[in-house]
Amino acid sequence: MGTSIVNLNQKIELPPIQVLFESLNRENETKPHFEERRLYQPNPSFVPRTNIAVGSPVNPVPVSSPVFFIGPSPQRSIQNHNAIMTQNIRQYPVIYNNNREVISTGERNYIITVGGPPVTSSQPEYEHISTPNFYQEQRLAQPHPVNESMMIGGYTNPQPISISRGKMLSGNISTNSVRGSNNGYSAKEKKHKAHGKRSNLPKATVSILNKWLHEHVNNPYPTVQEKRELLAKTGLTKLQISNWFINARRRKIFSGQNDANNFRRKFSSSTNLAKF
């Protein structure tokens, strides 16, 4: 009980009046410029407006769209700046600046917009290898000399075939072509003989066939036995003999008696020429 009385009688020191006036002046000072940022939200609502001074009343402000009055915060601005920089670096292609440091097109645009040092246009934005120098180095590295007339776009043309090789190829081609033509001619001749087409038969063979035809003028159609006899005498094939008689009948030399007489005269003249 005694201790409580001592505490009540203890002197309490109040702050000086000047300090109180200074605190009031701080409240009446001009407030810093607030940055207005609109955040797109689906449902607009009442957003309270806050002051920097501690203990000031909170007044809700009705707005049509959500608006935040945010005071300047250097730490937050630095974080936002870093986030924007990283986003731009991921989004835009990489280029090189004067100091050979990797920057992005978005970062370059951001520096120009904010007012930082712009990228100078004296140096090209994109680095590339010069084509003539690159191919010139390749040309110098070659062990054997190359003429300029053989270079097209830095590459060498294939060497043409030499004349001697061309002559050799042409000679082989000509020889093969001659052999092929001879083989083709012989095959064609064999084909003609196989099919019994008209060819120059020996005179002795023709005289034998004409003799049989003269003896059988009225019926120039040899039987199977007669054909066998003619095959044995002439040495021809059965197909050749049949074709020869077909052609002889197509000449219409057996149409009448006069034709038969003419045939006899021709046959006699041909036999006389064969004797001579």
Curated annotation (Swiss-Prot):
The keyword Nucleus applies. One of its GO terms (molecular function) is chromatin binding. CDD domains: homeodomain (cd00086). The keyword Nucleus applies. GO terms for cellular component: chromatin; nucleus. It comes from the Eukaryota. Its main location: nucleus. InterPro entries: HD, Homeodomain-like_sf, KN_HD, TALE_homeobox. Transmembrane segments: none annotated. It is found in: Nucleus. Residues 194-256 bind DNA. GO terms for biological process: regulation of DNA-templated transcription. Residues 176-199 are annotated as: Disordered. Keywords: DNA-binding, Homeobox, Nucleus. Residues 189-199 have a biased composition (Basic residues). Residues 176-185 have a biased composition (Polar residues). Belongs to the TALE/CUP9 homeobox family. PANTHER family: HOMEOBOX PROTEIN TRANSCRIPTION FACTORS. This is Homeobox protein TOS8. It comes from Saccharomyces cerevisiae (strain ATCC 204508 / S288c) (Baker's yeast).
